[in-house]
Regions:
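HDAC/HDAC-like amidohydrolase catalytic core signature
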Residues: 1-156, 161-310
């Protein structure tokens, strides 16, 4: 079996103003780092409207299209900009996640990594925010449940920022376990550990600024991995944000590439135990280009090793 890499040139068509941290160079850094890796490269399709309607209302999709500018940028909030190519890029991001689920469920790949932008985990049901437009991972989870007939899907988000959008989109469905580790206090100001969702299927792990890999690993071992194990997911989805890296300029955690490789391996262990190794990972944050590239490669190298039976 192999690891699939899903991406599309359209994702470079989402342009942000000069100096914006969510820039085209992020995707270039990831893809350059993965050059030469033993991956099956797959062209990410556009998401079908019905797939996005599982997590966003039609009026919201229409509003995003309507806000798309003919040139320049349209600001949806102080951080989140549309350019003429942004809508296509956002549809490719969601389409990549959904196609990756189809490939892994069909046995066409052991696992998959979606190298797309813009990211998705801050997009709420009717609100674009935090660089995000559509809930890519949430849409993939709902597709797995409704299209593939799964009963239990786990999402693990180790981006340095709380995955408020993903939580907003999945917490009402008891078939989804959502776990987020994140620095607190930090944008977007959500993700208190006491917030466990209406069905007790939300696990929020708040880490203080300056927390290092030892603290991250201990929190994962204590709070996230046992919950995922007990949930026995038939598929694990990862929101792979690498902005908890010590070199990242937007936050203050102190993780290294080794920590990202470690959590990837531990999640793969759980996937092996419960789902035949089925894992789909989607790129979220990461804003120091060199650290982002190294971290993404460390993450994907573990997926490749596990996908080939290592």
């Amino acid at each position: 079996m192999t690891t699939a890499l899903l991406t599309h040139p359209d994702c470079a068509g989402h342009l942000t103003p000069p100096g914006h941290p969510e820039q085209v160079a992020r995707l270039d850094a990831v893809l350059s780092a993965l050059d030469g890796a033993d991956l099956v490269r797959v062209t990410a399709p556009l998401a079908a409207e019905d797939d996005l309607l599982r997590v966003h209302p039609r009026a919201y999709l229409d509003s995003i299209r309507a806000a798309s500018p003919a040139e320049g940028w349209a600001a949806l909030d102080p951080d989140t900009y549309l350019s003429p190519g942004s809508v296509a890029a956002a549809f490719r991001g969601a389409g990549a996640a959904i196609r990756a689920v189809d490939m892994v469920m069909a046995g066409e790949a052991a696992n998959a990594f979606c190298a797309t932008r813009p990211p998705g985990h801050h997009a709420e049901r009717e609100t674009a925010m935090g660089f995000c437009f559509f809930g890519n991972v949430a849409a993939a989870a709902m597709h797995a449940l409704d299209h593939h007939g799964l009963s239990r899907v786990a999402i693990v988000d180790f981006d340095v920022h709380h995955g408020n959008g993903t939580q907003n989109l999945v917490e009402d469905d008891p078939r989804v376990l959502f776990c987020s580790s994140h620095q607190m206090p930090l944008y977007p100001g959500t993700g208190e550990p006491a917030d466990t969702g209406p069905h007790d299927t939300v696990v929020n792990v708040a880490l203080p600024g300056g927390a290092d890999g030892r603290m991250f690993r201990a929190a994962m071992e204590r709070e996230v991995l046992p919950r995922v194990d007990a949930f026995a997911p038939e598929l694990i989805l990862i929101s792979a944000g690498f902005d908890a890296h010590a070199d990242d300029p937007l936050a203050g955690l102190r993780l290294t590439e080794a920590d990202f490789a470690w959590i990837t391996g531990r999640l793969c262990d759980l996937a092996t135990a419960h789902s035949g190794g089925k894992v789909v990972s989607c790129l979220e944050g990461g804003y120091d280009l060199e650290a982002l590239g190294r971290s993404a490669r460390a993450h994907v190298d573990v997926l490749i090793e596990r996908g080939t039976g290592g």
